[in-house]
């Protein structure tokens, strides 16, 4: 009883205050939703949404009043309320505060020295805030929006790493003693490990925070989202504000208007079309021109032809140079060597040939220049001025860039100048297989060396050591460079200096026209090679949702949904009367040619990789069985043909044939990917798009196509009749029945009735019988 009396007295005392009485009688104690959450066992279905709802209130958090007063944090800053002098009913000596109070504490509070560290920790979030400030909002339109759920990157990163690579980087950066054996990624990118260690050294950060920073710096945060339009990471982080099922908010995001981003996009597209043209055994130059003229890019809200963009740009990268040479456009006096861009400043060298021996057996020739020349070079963030003469790099000054970029730039300049011991004796690890491509083309020795330094960090440093190590002696334009690419090392590389700022590229008003060979080598009027396909960096898997590839050879570069549709459209166009068309190959039972059609090969990369062998076995069995029994539908054969390209392999089949984007087709069953109707066999629907099945001749009228069957009449369907091609009709005897493909997926049985008969009479009878049979 005494306990209840005590509670009653306390309640009476509290009710003396009007505000407290109202809270005790009308409202709830503290936040009801929070109270309910912590006093029930119900699992929160959407904790993220609840947190956002709670943080949207004016004062969603509480703070210690004494600490606020000691830190001299005002109640208001820049017209934004930070906290109010109202005690929280759930915790004594705490008052209500806003989220802005935390920002004030971090950047204007007593620990202001930590502000730079905080900006580094939340670098990705602050970057997102800055990008949102750059958005140019436009009109809001109401329309039906065709959205596709796709895996997209929601955060732009300077360098993208896989999850396993990020974990390796975290271990080797933070826990060197406990790190596992070095993976191939660590061996190839040890310079990045050292850079990260130096970046976070002597900073007041615990290892958990640094691990978080590393993950956010290299992880693009991929998500499956319903998207439309271009799928740049800068746009995907705002996709929720740019459109829904029935509305679109027009806006120019930071990534779309960024000049550097557009330049990188164009380089990626040019690299793709160059590599695709190089894969052609013959006429690579003409193929490249076809690919360029059939491609367009979206710049903001405008669709522009790739051909125009290439001719307008002043980019001197090797991929753009090759494309511009193919189009006959003028260029400045520039050249490229691998991923390094070069521009000659002065001098004119004379070519001299020399020989180096591979494994002491095979002699390989290479060229060098006997006269002195000066060049400007650029690789990623590093730039350089250097001079070459004979087989040596006389001197080099490197400006700007991180240590790793400076090292790689120096190594490429050494190879370009044929400097170092490895142009006298080849490295022992270079084998005969490194001297040619998969297609059997010979690789020049300088490019063999370029590939060699890319294989491991040890190879790169071995080449740099061949430059020669001397006591540190600062140069005129900057400090000496050590073997690790840093300044003011105890031991430095011979005649290599560093300056803090970047070196500006010298202007060149003189324009030249380059010729492009079928080997995709661009050379000037004197025969000097300016760029070659070997200069292109290794291909990366990049998808282009804001680029339109119209050429059928480039179908695999489109987004997968469009590529599947275009692939089926190309297969349907093969339903003709030619010897190499699908009906003729079926009639001849030439399965090998059927499975290796160019259209089938183009769709091969769209098949789920880990199941392609199993799908091929099932699809080939379906095709051969149906053709052998004579009970088949051309529509169904077209559906499974893309899955027949690969070598068959035993395995469990689930009943569906999946593409790599998780869409699928099912034999004998219509779905949104591939569907057709027996009532109207003239059309096939792929992803809702109607594709017309062609007739056997280039005529739009069914009756005139039958005029070619003079001496035959349509009869009742006979599955026992042999399937023949149009060319084999001359061998059919009087009274014999044959089956023939007549167009739009239809197969009819014909009987030889006479050796000669008026075509018009046959047409009238045949048309009537076909209409009756339908």
From Swiss-Prot:
Record protein name field: Polymerase basic protein 2
Any one GO biological process: 7-methylguanosine mRNA capping
Origin: domain of life: Viruses
First-listed, main subcellular location of the protein, grouped into a coarse class: virion
Disulfide-bond pairs as recorded: none
Subunit structure, as described in the record: Influenza RNA polymerase is composed of three subunits: PB1, PB2 and PA. Interacts (via N-terminus) with PB1 (via C-terminus). Interacts with nucleoprotein NP (via N-terminus).
Key word Membrane present: no
